[in-house]
């Protein structure tokens, strides 16, 4: 029997945390975080991680599970989420997957086999070093030369994805796009995919406010503490929004005002990319939080869930 899951997605700062908690309270659910930054311990402010008080007693999974220098792949998420969905279902609770990391959502929606995923750690490290020494454009030019089709679909500054495309090509001889085309829907789950959005002006105001709050509540001190603990700026965890900008400020690349301006701008751009990603899902059902009160949205989603899964 397929396991029922509610998937709640949307851009950063849209209101996923509050909405997912409210839904859990009504559905007797537990939350599985699909946020690649909230995995890390000691990184609370910059990841907008819900505090214990904000969690309101609702079980949250895949938050605070690894150190900032540890690795956690999409395959790891897929495996852990599958285990959690099974355990939550067996407890007669309702699994709610909530977050904005598109690849994590993909790994549950589609039958993606990571056990045979092509990888070459030595090559990856060399390409990462090339990007650091010669710049993002250097490795992007390599991709343009060997897989121009993939290069048109990947931003030059998305170094992680550029390197992954090169890795796939070097190891398999296949183009990155071809490697991804055989994906079919995951038959283990019966997902209801709900997307949260807001009018752009309101979303951007919320993003700007969130950044200001992060600074006021100690983001700079959080980053300093992490660096003082010996975590280095080269870590993948520090490539996340909020951390890379503050590290650049601490290194003297920007003054604080400029760092905050850049962080707000980059977060708005990230939200736009998230919306573009989630709009690709034909099955997604969108709810605009600007149009209605949060309580009305909750009731509308609950009615949808009950009808979709025949819960009434």
UniProtKB/Swiss-Prot annotation:
Name of this protein: tRNA dimethylallyltransferase
Natural source organism: Alkaliphilus metalliredigens (strain QYMF)
EC numbers: 2.5.1.75
Function: Catalyzes the transfer of a dimethylallyl group onto the adenine at position 37 in tRNAs that read codons beginning with uridine, leading to the formation of N6-(dimethylallyl)adenosine (i(6)A).
Keyword field contains Ribosomal protein: no
Family statement drawn from the similarity comment of this UniProt entry: Belongs to the IPP transferase family.
One GO term of the biological process aspect: tRNA modification
Catalyzed reaction equations: adenosine(37) in tRNA + dimethylallyl diphosphate = N(6)-dimethylallyladenosine(37) in tRNA + diphosphate
Keywords: ATP-binding, Magnesium, Nucleotide-binding, Transferase, tRNA processing
One Gene Ontology MF term: tRNA dimethylallyltransferase activity
Site location (Interaction with substrate tRNA): 101, 124
Name of encoding gene: miaA
Subunit and partners: Monomer.
Annotated residues for binding of substrate: 12-17
Cofactor names: Mg(2+)
Pfam families associated with the record: IPPT
Enzyme superclass (EC): transferase
PANTHER family in the record: TRNA DIMETHYLALLYLTRANSFERASE
Residues that hold ATP according to the record: 10-17
Domain of life: Bacteria
UniProt region (Interaction with substrate tRNA), positions on chain: 35-38
């Amino acid at each position: 029997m397929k396991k029922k899951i509610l998937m709640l997605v949307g851009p950063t700062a849209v209101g996923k945390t509050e909405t997912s908690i409210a839904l859990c309270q009504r559905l007797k659910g537990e939350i599985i975080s699909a946020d690649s930054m909230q995995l890390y311990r000691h990184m609370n402010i910059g990841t907008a991680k819900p505090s214990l008080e904000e969690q309101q007693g609702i079980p949250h999974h895949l938050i605070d599970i690894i150190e900032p220098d540890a690795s956690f792949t999409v395959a790891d998420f897929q495996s852990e989420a599958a285990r959690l969905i099974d355990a939550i279902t067996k407890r007669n609770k309702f699994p709610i997957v909530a977050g904005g990391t598109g690849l994590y959502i993909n790994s549950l929606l589609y039958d993606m086999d990571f056990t045979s995923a092509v990888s070459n750690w030595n090559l990856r490290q060399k390409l990462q070093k090339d990007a650091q020494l010669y710049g993002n454009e250097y490795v992007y030019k390599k991709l343009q030369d060997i897989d121009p089709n993939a290069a048109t679909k990947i931003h030059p500054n998305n170094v992680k994805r550029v390197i992954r495309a090169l890795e796939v090509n070097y190891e398999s001889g296949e183009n990155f796009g071809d490697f991804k085309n055989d994906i079919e829907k995951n038959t283990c789950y019966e997902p209801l995919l709900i997307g949260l959005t807001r009018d752009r002006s309101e979303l951007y105001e919320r993003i700007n406010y969130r950044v200001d709050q992060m600074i006021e509540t100690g983001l700079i001190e959080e980053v300093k503490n992490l660096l003082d603990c010996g975590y280095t700026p080269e870590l993948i965890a520090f490539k996340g929004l909020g951390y890379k900008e503050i590290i650049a400020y601490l290194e003297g690349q920007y003054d604080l005002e400029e760092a905050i301006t850049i962080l707000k701008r980059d977060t708005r751009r990230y939200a736009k990319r998230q919306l573009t990603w989630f709009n690709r899902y034909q099955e997604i059902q969108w709810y605009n939080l600007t149009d209605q009160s949060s309580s009305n949205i909750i009731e509308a989603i609950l009615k949808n869930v009950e009808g979709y899964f025949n819960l009434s």
